[in-house]
Amino acid sequence: MAGRFGYEIGDYKFVPEEFLPATVCDKIVGARVSDPGLIRRIARARKRRPALTRDGKLTILSVDHPARMVTRVGDNPLAMGDRYELLARVSRVLTDSRFDGFMATADVVEELLILDYMVQRAGGPSFLGEKVILGCMNRGGLAGVSFEMDDTMTGYTARAINDMGLDGAKLMFRLEPGSCESGKTIMYCVNAINELVDL
């Protein structure tokens, strides 16, 4: 029997409600509205690693697909479009010590920071402490649209990554030989790298 997302691992089936209360999204929105400065304080206070990698390797969970309209998982075209399930699955994965961290756009990073803060306030352990967090920068190349290869910097800026105390940035470049838009994206990435280096 296929799960809601159209796949299962053996007999295992992830049930979000068994891991994370279904009311969590409302609480995250409430925290954003009632205390706009909370996210920055949480981010700046987060315990970071003394070194990026412990063994020369990194296992990073990618959570930036929905930002460019990629939401399909298995036979469900909108699986990653369900924010509650996305947060439940990502936070569950990040509790595993074999994962070093994640990459995401600002909306997801901020919601995970708030969720981690709420878990700690409730007496639980941090699932983001000493995890590597990478801010995704260019998500403007929306999947399937005419300007997909013109992948503009619609995510984090270099300054925002630095201000939030993130551990690094993620850029994506796809070479499409028949598209001059790829050439523009090369320069977007070069400029972003230079800005990051200058910080």
Q: What does each of the following model-derived ranges do?
A:
Residues A2-A51, A67-Y117:
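An N-cap/entry alpha-helix motif that binds or orients negatively charged groups
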Residues K47-T53, G123-S126:
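Short boundary motifs at domain starts and secondary-structure transition points
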Residues L58, E130-L134, L199:
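Proline-centered loop/turn at the N-terminus of a beta-strand
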Residues L61:
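Conserved, mostly hydrophobic/aromatic
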